Amino acid sequence: MEDVELTLTPDDYSLLTDLYQLTMAACYVGENIDQRRASFEITVRRLPPRCGYLIAMGLAQALDYLEKLRFSSAQVEALQSIGIFDHALAQFWTLLREAQFSGDVWAVPEGTAIFANEPLLRIEAPLWQAQLVETYLLNTLNYQTLVATRSARMRDVAGADATLLEFGTRRAFSPQGALWAARAALAAGLDATSNVLAAVKLGRKPSGTMAHALVMALSATEGTEAEAFTAFHRYFPGAPLLIDTYDTIAAAHALSDQIKAGNLQLSAVRIDSGDLGSLSRQVRAILPGVAIIASGDLDEWKIAELKAAGACIDGYGIGTQLVTGSPVNGIYKLVEIDDIPVMKESPGKITYPGRKQIFRRVENGIVQRDRLSLIHETPDHEQPLMQLVFKQGQRMQESDSLSTIAERTRASVASLPPSVRDINQPESIPLDLSDHLSALIEKTRRKTAES
């Protein structure tokens, strides 16, 4: 097969979907229901293991996708050439050529803590449009919510004063995923990313240290580890140095001697291997005025262990465990069509009918419970979480800044009870179903059984 360019651009958005979204759209056209008003909601049935909450993230990219979704003539011709749509009506091709998202979008703001069975986002649009966008929306919301949740948990465990650096680009699932991961991490409270492209695009200063390769290469060619450090500081004065290539403690002593002699200014050292707790305490005694950064497959549990063991660590470089991990299995399900509520009743995969709102009860700054209600219901000393962000295909407002989202994340996590923030055996916030929603569930079940 001939090699082709597979780098994603906004021009590709229309075809970045599963085939069945297009075949269903063609069927809707044939059955003359493609323009029926449909509502789909994204929810998560179950939280990932040992996770008491999720941090919603990815809305900005979802709205960007909806704004730019178009089919080019070449893309329509490509679909026509594959032989799958030979029986599709001519109106289907006209629909694609003129495609532009014209619906409404309701969503919880990025950085908001949410729980199982609560909608992150709702699409209200002509049926064929609402169907088509499922794949991309789940892709961006699921992944960024995963990274944001892990970032928020690590920040919660490490504390507000710790420096947290996103180092996950090499372990992310794709170059695009690496950019989304960097954004989600920064928006959920991490201090910086090593991903240069992400940092530049997001208006942030990238952060990083050095790799063992530089120490080994310069040690081999210039004589010693100390000379490798001197060479690096010649171009990046005071920059953090990686000191565990050969002997962490010996390197720390050598640097201490240079500092005492007035020959060196040093902002930080990084330790990437060994017993991080023990090594950090020894290095702190040798270099008391130098920040210590730890890295090496760290996650919230390892950070908690290090803190409990009295490790002298000022910052953490977090990579693999941040950008991978247990997936967020968000689902995108039809809840209403032409004002007719619908629900799925498969065992273990039940969905709730109707367009819904989340009402959150907060007392003395702490979340007490959530209530899942229908959109016509009103709050009872509660906060409505879902907001109208897109109306008739147009944004209602500009996307929030990363700093705004990061502050929302911080406040949202701080409002959760300690039992929900626990990283080992977390509880979840109680979710009540309103009387109106409960009645609608029973009514929809009876109607389904009768039909």
Each predicted region: which residue ranges?
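Ordered alpha/beta subdomains of enzyme catalytic regions
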Residues: M1-Y235, Q265, I331-S451
